Swiss-Prot record:
Belongs to the UPF0736 family. InterPro entries: UPF0736. This is UPF0736 protein BA_1187/GBAA_1187/BAS1098. It comes from Bacillus anthracis. It holds the Pfam family DUF3603.
Length: 248
């Protein structure tokens, strides 16, 4: 088995979508960075790699057995053994996983560029391990609270966070079924549509607003998000947390 040593990780917990597991250049000063003293490295096929990166589903039993108690974390000068912790690659992408004792990839992290390069060199001439696992035949269902990667492509960490906050606010707005309110918000988004939305039903206006807001990220998106979350303490807190960030 291959091993990496002194690996810096920045765990993102409970993320089913790989786009929310930030690459090194998006790490922030207030992120909690940990040091893996030793961690096993596995090369797998692309199907399994994408399953691990983009799902929160059961890992193959044989894989868990292969990495059991083989990783150590360095904390306060102590070397602590980890239950199921490993780095996995298909030769194209790389992700570190810590199940925190479960059989699903609860915590995920990218590596720093120098260590990514080392991984690619180490696995270049290595055969991918074969692990049996059940892949759902159905295509993964993306929805407003778990957007498709296409909706998030090209955005910074801050923009992704704010876009997800906007979608949470839109999802809550959907539960109100308040036609006057959705007409107001669509007119805020597109003032030229004022006349048109007066003749449309709630569901049609909401669907059109969501459909238009899905594309990209702009000042217009940010303004709508800021106005929608106003007066809602939980959403406002998330908004403030993101806007304290000067970069990313």
């Amino acid at each position: 088995m291959l091993y990496l040593h002194d690996v810096w990780v920045n765990w993102f917990e409970g993320e089913e979508n790989g786009y929310n597991v930030c690459h090194f250049y998006e790490w922030r000063k207030d992120d909690t960075i940990e040091l893996l003293d030793q961690v096993p490295l596995l090369k797998v096929d692309s199907t399994l790699y994408h399953y691990i990166e983009n799902e929160l589903l059961e890992l193959p039993q044989k894989l868990l057995e292969d990495v059991h108690h083989k990783a150590y974390i360095r904390k306060n000068h102590e070397r602590l053994q980890q239950e199921y912790c490993f780095v996995v690659t298909d030769g194209k992408g790389i992700i570190a996983i810590d199940t925190i004792g479960y059989n699903v990839p609860i915590r995920k992290s990218r590596l720093i560029p120098r260590q990514e390069q080392m991984v690619y060199e180490m696995v270049e001439n290595v055969q991918a391990e074969k692990y049996e696992f059940q892949v759902e035949e159905m295509e993964k269902e993306h929805h407003i609270l778990s957007p498709s990667p296409f909706v998030m492509n090209g955005l910074t960490r801050k923009e992704r966070q704010l876009k997800q906050l906007l979608f949470m606010a839109l999802d809550q707005l959907h539960t109100t079924k308040n036609t006057a309110e959705i007409r107001y918000w669509f007119t805020e988004w597109d003032p030229s549509a004022y006349g048109m939305v007066q003749h449309m039903e709630f569901e049609d206006i909401w669907a059109k607003l969501y459909d238009e807001a899905k594309t990209g990220w702009s000042e217009k998106h940010e303004q709508l998000c800021e106005r929608l979350v106003k007066g809602q303490p939980f959403f406002e807190k998330l908004w403030e947390m993101e806007n304290e960030q000067k970069v990313n």
